[in-house]
Amino acid sequence: MEKNIKEIKETIKADFVNSRAVIKNYETPDGTIYMTKTIEHFNIGIMDNYGALIWANDSNYSLTEDFETAWSDMVKNYSDYEVERLRKEIENKWF
């Protein structure tokens, strides 16, 4: 049974929320906790165990930032093709 985009988003969102426990103690030298908005580190909220830490010193998002905002900002500079490719990667990995 094919999942729709809303269900996929909810799965990603839930996984992202669950991942916070793994990384909540990471702080930069100035004490700020960061998450990245890049594909390489953020992995669309999919954690590949501890190795896929969500951190990036150049990010302006805190871990309390709204997921939808982070997702929208992350993909806004990508082409429709790239966003579709990411969506397919998520579907292939999860469903």
Region spans (language model):
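Negatively charged, low-complexity tracts enriched in Asp/Glu with abundant Ser/Thr
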Residues: M1-D30, E91-W94
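Acidic, low-complexity, intrinsically disordered interaction modules
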Residues: V17-R85
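Short, aromatic- and cysteine-enriched interfacial helices/patches
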Residues: I54, W94-F95
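Acidic, proline/glycine-rich low-complexity IDRs
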Residues: V83, R87-K93
